[in-house]
Regions:
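Receiver (REC) domain switch/output surface
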Residues: 15-29
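Conserved HAMP-HisKA connector
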Residues: 48-64
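Metal-dependent catalytic cores of enzymes that make or break cyclic nucleotides
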Residues: 60-277
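A structural signal for hydrophobic residues in beta-strands of small regulatory alpha/beta folds
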Residues: 7-8, 16
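Signal-transmission coiled-coil "S-helix" linker that connects upstream sensory/regulatory modules
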Residues: 27, 31-34, 38-52, 99
């Protein structure tokens, strides 16, 4: 506990009474200020979520998909991160980080807005030339966010930049666009990458049929979709029974909230604790 005042002996009752009154008054003002800031933060988080959802929905529509993919990525990202935080403190994440990564995950493919529609929605396998063009969506998305100069200090924007550019990197360095290896890849991009691959496997696309849940897990674990962080594979195996349930529940609600019901940033302030080829 902090000390806001002290009284020297001998005590004067009138002085004690006034000091107590001042302390109570100061505390009330502090609480009012905390509630005001918390309310502003909550409004900002809400506005961020609305804008992210709008932008990701635009990309999904152009990509010939519903918002289901974005929703699923957010849910999978959040439950993977929760499990990861329970297993290790290696990445020094807070609940605020978890919420921001889950929200930013909705922008992972925003760069596809710069890819030709004929390539995005081609029902056959892409040619090598088309595939090279498709791969550019990572850098396009990153560049779009980099151009938001006035928002570069925003944690949400920085995380979204990481995810956009590096969500197709692989743990063994065989991904793109930069061939990053291991934990050179930000954990935000690692988790979204795994969530993206799982959802791409288990859902129908214009060029492929959906793969059953168990088969998708097997393909990921055995490295058929590229190598992932062994810790994340452990997390995936530990939550694999919950994944279909979580996604089905979200589908019934027809919505998802990356911040969940527990806005940790605001709650913390109020408590003052404070390839898919």
């Amino acid at each position: 506990m902090g000390v806001s005042d002290y009284i020297s002996r001998p005590f004067d009752t009138s002085v004690v009474r006034q000091r107590v009154y001042n302390t109570i008054k100061l505390y009330a003002k502090q609480r009012k200020l905390i509630d005001l800031v918390a309310g502003q933060m909550q409004e900002k988080e809400k506005n961020n979520q609305i804008m992210v959802n709008i932008l990701s929905h635009i990309v999904e529509c152009r990509n010939g998909e519903s918002g289901q993919h974005v929703r699923n990525i957010g849910i999978l990202t959040k439950i993977l991160l929760k499990k990861l935080m329970q297993k290790t403190d290696r990445y020094q994440m807070t609940w605020g980080d978890l919420n921001r990564i889950a929200l930013a995950s909705a922008l992972h493919d925003i760069g596809k807005i710069g890819i030709e529609e004929a390539i995005l929605n081609k029902p056959e396998k892409l040619t090598q030339e088309e595939y090279e063009k498709m791969k550019k969506h990572t850098v396009i998305g990153w560049s779009m966010l980099q151009n938001l100069k006035q928002y570069q200090e925003e944690p949400l924007v920085r995380i979204a930049e990481q995810i956009c550019r590096w969500h197709h990197e692989r743990y063994d360095g065989k991904g793109y666009p930069d061939g990053l290896k291991g934990d050179e890849i930000p954990i935000s991009a690692q988790v979204v990458s795994l969530a993206d691959v799982y959802d791409a496997l288990t859902n129908e696309r214009v060029y492929k049929k959906a793969i059953p849940h168990e088969k998708a897990i097997e393909m990921i674990v055995t490295g058929e979709c590229g190598q992932f962080n062994p810790l994340l594979i452990e997390c995936l195996l530990e939550i694999k029974e919950d994944i279909p349930i979580q996604l089905m529940n979200a589908e019934h609600r027809n919505s998802w909230t990356p911040l969940g019901g527990d806005n940790t940033l605001v709650a913390g302030l109020k408590d003052r604790r404070i390839e898919d080829k």
